Amino acid sequence: MIFIPTNGTTFLLLDGQPAVFSAVAQKLYALNTEAALIWCGFEEGEPASSVVDRLVASGVSPTDAATYVNQAARKWVRLGLLQVHIASFDGLATECAFTVSLGRSTWTFEFNGESVAQSVLQLFEHHEPPLESGNRLKIIEAKGLVYVFDNDRCVLTCAMDDVVPSIKAYLTEQLVSQCAPDIAFHAACLEHNAKALLISGDPGAGKTTLALYLVQHGRLACCADDIVLIRSDGTVTGVPFAPTIKSGAWRILEEFIPDLEDVPVHRRPDGKRVKYLNALAMVRNGSVYPVGGIVFLRRRSRGDAKLVPLRRLDVLKRVITGSYSPNRRMSHASLIAFKNMLTQADLFELSYSNVAEAGAAILGMYDGKS
């Protein structure tokens, strides 16, 4: 394996004391003599086996040298000081590839193994043959770990159990950072009669659970369960990841989605267990709709479901709080987009304790509407 320093990482000597500084973490790490030898070997592009030989030449036993190099590499990768170089996998052929469209961007995935590809496909309902243009991720499984390269730069190293949630988290981060001129809004997006219904709320408020209930019990189609892109004219488009279902909602949803029981379980970076439902007949990427309604969820431990109308100014504040732009600032153009989005929308807060009652309250908004 070949490791190289990450961008912004610098080796230095201070009064003879070797150290490494990370500009990203804003931390300084002191190194002992053996660690300094190991670091310099990696910095010079040597493979791990050659770094072990360098340590042995300094007087360390072969067994100890191999242990030191392995432990140092793992620790420095975890700290973000080192990254795996793609040259470590020269000679590995691409066995399968596909492209997905997310918002305004396309992502092509290349794999050296079919099993990882099938796991990652759980994130998407629609995919196409690989394209030559657009963003490209190379996903390599080796010795029980999965390495993800974006433009030949290692951006993720994780276990097989973590690869699907980790890739979704990375893609989400990239989509938000590249979404200009659109604005990313944290909400589920459903389509009814060529208009969008946005369902927003704090983490754990039940956006995905309620959205899936509405899809199964109403005439609504799912566009997205967590990311909506707001365009300059106020129309929106959902980012069509397969809905992420947390473990607390499995029992509720299995009552009307029986196949959910057989969907594989994944572990997110935050430790939560999730399933991805990619058999929902989701709206295809790029479908754009005016917003017909926005519902903000307020989950309670008890009490009947209740819809309360909201003023547009109050909703604007909430939308600003739940939105993200590449420069992390809302501009005049952003405010105009929000205003355009809210102009013709029905705006409510929904307090509820029972998903079925909440779903009935929202479906009641459409009674009498075609």
Task: Give the label of every model feature segment.
Residues 1-36, 40:
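Acidic, low-complexity/disordered tracts enriched in E/D and polar residues
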Residues 14, 49, 188, 192-201, ...:
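Glycine-rich, often acidic-flanked micro-motifs
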Residues 24-98, 102-103:
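Long, charge-rich, low-complexity alpha-helical segments
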Residues 85-142:
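Transition-metal
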Residues 126, 130-176, 364-369:
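Charged, amphipathic alpha-helical linker segments immediately N-terminal to NTP-binding catalytic cores
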Residues 177-192:
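Pre-Walker A adenine-sensing motif
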Residues 207:
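Conserved lysine of the Walker
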Residues 210-211:
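Post-Walker A alpha-helix
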